[in-house]
């Protein structure tokens, strides 16, 4: 999963809400921050490792990782979001599942419900060759693809024929086009349908008249005594022929290609339907003599018979008749095979039956050609019975002829039937396809449907979209809308979120690895994603300038306008130096290594420094034990100029190198500010930087019922600054404030020792050195002789610290009354019962008790000692300390002994 967006930047912000494309360094950083990448194909999200995509580097997804510029990314994908590490492809999501599995498993399969042609197009888009298909899917894929290609070829031929009907090179193209559609395309309009129905009625009427003219009752004898057509029926036939002639001439005149019109099979049928009538009239009127009429009479009869071909004109209006004609034309191989089988059978069986029946009296099988008729009707299983064999041998031959005829005819007939069925379906499909294409063309001409590339459409309408969104954003300035116009950076929303809520230990190590190596700040990527258009930065800037001219009140540049609701940008810096303090001042004492770091600290404790430390307040909740030390800075310090504000520390990951470098920490209290100085030159022992905790709450668990106030320090997070990250152990710790008017070390002691008692109850703590423990830590129980130890209570993560300056005098009195007890260095852990905690606090100054049952907890010890003693033991290399602030512990009298496990507060 991609790394989460920094808290300073809204995670829901897309690239389309920003003005300029991202820099190459931002694109490279977003790819290197995570081992995984999100791929959104048609709205369906997929998550895959980068190394999985690297298996096919020459494919589209394989090239995705090498694209480091905005233009190269848009050549590979349609859109992207660097904050989410997500890349969008506007393609078929179902086909991509098979393609992504090919990257993972190396096996390419095609889903059963997937169209072969569509799957082939998807393979071409993603850059994968179809030869990688598995054998189980390859045959099905190629079969479907060939079938689809054949259908597309036929449709293309039909469309070429339709597109070949050009009327531009002729006179009156529009009128001729309308007339052609009226006569040739019955479905083009209502008038064309009516005209087709009238034409069919004339065909039927002429056929009926032709049939009735052969009836003797309706015939009339001419002057030569020969029967002739009825006059009334002749008039009906003349009207029909006139209609057919007019239709044929109009079709010929309106046709775009005259030669092609003559070669058309349907047009040939129309010509044969009307030509015999005119030939008969010409022959009859030109030859009036009896002798000449007798010579041409037979020719006239032939042309009269040809008039029956008018019935074939119905094929123009019937898809079934057209399919029959095309089937016979396409099945000429099967028809030829059928005729060949029949001819061979007829020849064989007619010869056999002739030799079997020639010796019989009054036989009808007088010759082999005379036997052809019997063999034909026998093989076709008709059997008229006008001729049949009489002998036994002839009957056997007749039986074999019947069986052979059934087998011979049954072989090619199904092929012909199948061809007819397929062609009929194909004709229906082509008719629907032609209608659909014509409807789309008409809609395109009318402007209803615009056929263009989606990217080009977005690119052309980008200006309109920007202006519309800008106007909509002006009316909604008071609302916290995330989907704001990317040309209005003054209204960008920066969501403030604690880092501990959006990150984990592992994510910190991965996310800021590159930043720690480059030793630079994390650069917020303000150029996420935009719409999938190929707009360059220059075009966007030009559009930006135009909008700023038209809208002078809107300042896209946040530096050019005042924003009273946003505090000024400032940065904090921590000055790390050694502070020379008197012997009574506190310093960090030496401590040994903490073995089980996973249960004692958490990286998320660093991230809790996210709020302001402007004034002290009393927490309404009782502070639990083992909390964290947190600091806070005001947003605007009085009297502090912007040039005096230091820069925040860079974002660094926790170093995993365990080096011997330790840090000496001292707390310097001044009337104006407080500076926590960490000197990396001191060597208290090797550090333990690898203190990442699996669970942030694992280091917060404890059984000590101690109730005191903890110090909280919060870094003021600037809204426009980069998100804060846990500082590295190799960097100084920033602590700077100006709102802490403490002057003495005893004042700090008051802060550390003050209990969270009910209101009205005086503090019970004395200035005794007491021990506070939660049980012996697993693995070690160090002792620190000659140490001044003071209690420092902890609280749960992100809890606020109470600093009540009104009780300073009580603590100073306690300090003066028991000066001898403060010098006691021996640590001691009292094992009193929880019920006797208050008595022990009053009598011995202990601030907490622990039970022996809590020995499995990994306790922590936060110890302060005098600066002089720390300097004295700075040469010791056997001790190790954690790179965090340590709270002091109050120990009991010198006579008491015990083990005080370390208690650590990480920041």
UniProtKB/Swiss-Prot annotation:
Residues 813-823, 833-845 have a biased composition (Basic and acidic residues). GO terms for molecular function: delayed rectifier potassium channel activity; protein heterodimerization activity. Residues 1-22, 503-534, 680-742, 761-859, 887-907 are annotated as: Disordered. The chain crosses the membrane at residues 191-212, 233-254, 266-284, 297-317, 333-354, 396-424. Phosphorylated. Phosphorylation at Ser-608 of the FFAT motif activates interaction with MOSPD2, VAPA and VAPB. It comes from the Eukaryota. The keyword Cell membrane applies. Residues 1-190, 255-265, 318-332, 425-907 are cytoplasmic. A motif (Selectivity filter) lies at residues 381-386. Pfam families: BTB_2 (PF02214), Ion_trans (PF00520), Kv2channel (PF03521). Residues 525-534, 690-723 have a biased composition (Polar residues). The modification Phosphoserine is found at residues 448, 608. Glycans are attached at residue 287. Keywords: Cell membrane, Cell projection, Glycoprotein, Ion channel, Ion transport, Membrane, Phosphoprotein, Potassium, Potassium channel, Potassium transport, Transmembrane, Transmembrane helix, Transport, Voltage-gated channel. It is found in: Cell membrane; Perikaryon; Cell projection, Dendrite. Residues 213-232, 285-296, 355-368, 389-395 are extracellular. GO terms for biological process: potassium ion transmembrane transport; potassium ion transport; protein homooligomerization; protein localization to plasma membrane. SUPFAM superfamilies: POZ domain, Voltage-gated potassium channels. It catalyses: K(+)(in) = K(+)(out). Inhibited by quinine at micromolar levels. Modestly sensitive to millimolar levels of tetraethylammonium (TEA) and 4-aminopyridine (4-AP). Residues 369-380, 381-388 dip into the membrane without crossing it. Belongs to the potassium channel family. B (Shab) (TC 1.A.1.2) subfamily. Kv2.2/KCNB2 sub-subfamily. Homotetramer or heterotetramer with KCNB1. Heterotetramer with KCNS1 and KCNS2. Interacts (via phosphorylated FFAT motif) with VAPA and VAPB. The transmembrane segment S4 functions as a voltage-sensor and is characterized by a series of positively charged amino acids at every third position. Channel opening and closing is effected by a conformation change that affects the position and orientation of the voltage-sensor paddle formed by S3 and S4 within the membrane. A transmembrane electric field that is positive inside would push the positively charged S4 segment outwards, thereby opening the pore, while a field that is negative inside would pull the S4 segment inwards and close the pore. Voltage-gated potassium channel that mediates transmembrane potassium transport in excitable membranes, primarily in the brain and smooth muscle cells. Channels open or close in response to the voltage difference across the membrane, letting potassium ions pass in accordance with their electrochemical gradient. Homotetrameric channels mediate a delayed-rectifier voltage-dependent outward potassium current that display rapid activation and slow inactivation in response to membrane depolarization. This is Potassium voltage-gated channel subfamily B member 2. It comes from Mus musculus. The gene is Kcnb2.
